[in-house]
């Protein structure tokens, strides 16, 4: 058994076991940790297949952002998971049926999957010999699709700014300090001498 085959079986077994533990874990924090291990194992499989860019995306996006967000949400929110677990019994038959349908679809797809011999020659941009996957993808994005790539970045930037503007609300019922008005006020008018008579208020 070569090192490649051993690493493949190791990552595959760890990914399957960790995925099962995500579903079977009673503690939600443990489930998120098992989910992180599943993503890391899947990233290892992508590296073995030569898709190191996809592996880096999987680690940065899913492990570094989504899974950590899940972990913080689970740890910070006071959720009664015991009550939620009791309600899952009602939806178990429907969930099992959906799982069987999805499993049948995956099995059908694997049985009829067939790759043509001329598929590699029909690629839009085949990778040159001796060039890594990440380098080839970078050359395509920043050479052939440079303007489209920059346009996609601008669309994401506009979407981010729009989300900030939608959530930014200026409340009028809160007293705020107007620093600009204070800086431009006349010092002679800032103080006012008031002669208060005994027994009277302002």
Swiss-Prot record:
Annotated membrane-spanning segments are: 3-23, 31-51, 53-73, 93-113, 146-166
Principal location listed in the UniProt entry? membrane
Name the Enzyme Commission number(s) assigned to this protein: 7.1.1.-
Asked if the Swiss-Prot or TrEMBL record annotates the protein with the keyword Translocase, the reply is yes
Molecular function (Gene Ontology), one example:
NADH dehydrogenase (ubiquinone) activity
Which membrane topology term applies here? Answer: Multi-pass membrane protein
- Is Cytoplasm included in the keywords of this UniProt record? no
As its record notes, the protein acts as a catalyst of:
a quinone + NADH + 5 H(+)(in) = a quinol + NAD(+) + 4 H(+)(out)
Note the superkingdom of the native organism.
Bacteria
Q: Which cysteines are joined by disulfide bonds?
A: none
Q: What class of enzyme is it?
A: translocase
Phenotype upon knockout is: No functional NADH-quinone oxidoreductase complex. Cells lacking this gene have a nearly normal respiratory growth phenotype on lactate, however they are unable to perform anaerobic photosynthesis. It is suggested that in R.capsulatus this complex may function in reverse flow under physiological conditions.
**Family, similarity comment:** Belongs to the complex I subunit 6 family.
According to its UniProt entry, what is the function of this protein? NDH-1 shuttles electrons from NADH, via FMN and iron-sulfur (Fe-S) centers, to quinones in the respiratory chain. The immediate electron acceptor for the enzyme in this species is believed to be ubiquinone. Couples the redox reaction to proton translocation (for every two electrons transferred, four hydrogen ions are translocated across the cytoplasmic membrane), and thus conserves the redox energy in a proton gradient.
Fetch the NCBIfam families from UniProt: PRK06638.1-4 (NF005164)
Designated name of the protein = NADH-quinone oxidoreductase subunit J
What is the originating organism of this protein?
A: Rhodobacter capsulatus
